[in-house]
Amino acid sequence: MLSGGAGSIPELNAQISVCRACPRLVDWREEVAVVKRRAFADQPYWGRPVPGWGSEQPRLLIVGLAPAAHGANRTGRMFTGDRSGDQLYAALHRAGLVNLPISMDAADGLQANQIRITAPVRCAPPGNAPTQAEWVTCSPWLEAEWRLVSEYVRAIVALGGFAWQIVLRLPGVSAMRKPRFSHGVVAQLYAGVRLLGCYHPSQQNMFTGRLTPAMLDDIFRDAKKLAGI
């Protein structure tokens, strides 16, 4: 098994960080880490798979897609160092779910308030588009993480339709009904756990107004309440 039967979050994070299972993703993440974007030319790049971040006993789990090439692939922390992350962490801060309004790097002092942020694909994919084979290969990592945190989770926010479908396939997850993904939709899962749909805070979604800060605030206000935080 790819996840190696990790017994704790730190052990799982260590295993994730050295995975080389997908040749295309390995080549891309490492090429980006060497070539770099001009704005970050003087900064070291993580250039490895990105583990989940946040509480090891989260009441709220946030599921994205994959690291950004010059965001999490650079900083080593989910949604950190790119515009999507700027929008996400600002909203989380307004909701009282993190202690800082922006996430700059892994040493910036950011702390989670009973939340965890993760993704079904751990390496930055070319064009932000992992192949089906890649996310299937990567899926044991999320499944292992889910086994370690699921007993604490009371609410899940899926950032985008892909994350929505992935959550519904997690071990032990079943919905009383499975509505199609849309922004603001809520699915009742097992034992009172709720799954909330949210448009991904991508640069395109934010710039076009498909997703606004107010819409993010509504989602995380509701998620916080459902999670009992």
UniProtKB/Swiss-Prot annotation:
Per its UniProt entry, which superkingdom is the organism in? Answer: Bacteria
Any single biological process term in GO? base-excision repair
Pfam families under this entry? UDG (PF03167)
Q: Kindly give the Gene3D superfamilies that the UniProt entry links to this protein.
A: Uracil-DNA glycosylase-like domain
**InterPro entries given for it?**
UDG_Type-4/5 (IPR051536), UdgB-like (IPR044147), Uracil-DNA_glycosylase-like (IPR005122), Uracil-DNA_glycosylase-like_sf (IPR036895)
Gene (UniProt): udgB
Q: Describe the function of this protein.
A: DNA glycosylase with broad substrate specificity.
Spell out the family assignment given in the record's similarity comment.
Belongs to the uracil-DNA glycosylase (UDG) superfamily. Type 5 (UDGb) family.
Q: What is the lineage of its organism?
A: Bacteria, Bacillati, Actinomycetota, Actinomycetes, Mycobacteriales
* Binding positions for [4Fe-4S] cluster per the UniProt entry: C19, C22, C123, C138
List the Gene Ontology MF annotations in alphabetical order: 4 iron, 4 sulfur cluster binding; DNA-deoxyinosine glycosylase activity; metal ion binding; uracil DNA N-glycosylase activity
Top enzyme class of this protein? hydrolase
Instruction: Indicate yes or no for the key word Hydrolase.
Output: yes
Entry EC no(s):
3.2.2.-
According to UniProt, the name of this protein is Type-5 uracil-DNA glycosylase
UniProt keyword annotations, A-Z: 4Fe-4S, DNA damage, DNA repair, Hydrolase, Iron, Iron-sulfur, Metal-binding
